[in-house]
Amino acid sequence: MSRALDKAGRWIGWAFFADLANGLALTFGYMFSRPVTMQYPDKEKWLPYSRYRGHHFLKRDDEGEIKCVACELCARICPCDCIEVVPYEDEKGNRRPAKFEIDTARCLFCGLCEDACPADAIALGQQYEFSSFSSRDLVIGRDDLLAKPGKAMTGGGVVAARLNTERDVLVEASEPRGYNWWRNIRRK
């Protein structure tokens, strides 16, 4: 019985060794190939697709008024409780938000607020750079949400990065097709 167990143990040991050798060969192959790291933000910048869920922004109607009717559905459906809406009635008798704040530090960017809005007033844009030294800077008010840019119709490409002194400017991609992230990876 011990001889049978000894043979089975040797066979299992060789199988694990073969697996280990396969893994090491793959690792060494990648170690000497070109890196896939994108040179962000120094040399190139990724433009997200139009379906990307980035920053929040509020929309205006044709007359330039805010579309939000302060129904607070976005605040109620938000799983993170990061939206605060305080309604008021304007001089025309329309319900509008006196205060509309989104805490992007707590937000999951799930898009439920966008789906729940009956007036199509809130949407998620393509901006993905939110870095800040203070968490207070990540709370975005109504006026800032109205000033944010909307969605670009193109995206999914990589463009040369350039120093842009204008804030919140969307760069249009020259190529409408997607970007092949795995172009430098060896294929078997």
Curated annotation (Swiss-Prot):
Record EC number: 7.1.1.-
Transmembrane segments: none
Gene3D superfamilies listed in its UniProt record: 3.30.70.3270
Compartments in which it is found: Cell inner membrane
Catalyzed reactions per annotation: a quinone + NADH + 5 H(+)(in) = a quinol + NAD(+) + 4 H(+)(out)
Cofactor: [4Fe-4S] cluster
Location (main, coarse): membrane
Amino-acid positions noted as binding [4Fe-4S] cluster 1 in the UniProt annotation, renumbered to this chain: 68, 71, 74, 117
The family this protein is said to belong to: Belongs to the complex I 23 kDa subunit family.
Record function comment: NDH-1 shuttles electrons from NADH, via FMN and iron-sulfur (Fe-S) centers, to quinones in the respiratory chain. The immediate electron acceptor for the enzyme in this species is believed to be ubiquinone. Couples the redox reaction to proton translocation (for every two electrons transferred, four hydrogen ions are translocated across the cytoplasmic membrane), and thus conserves the redox energy in a proton gradient.
Designated name of the protein: NADH-quinone oxidoreductase subunit I 2
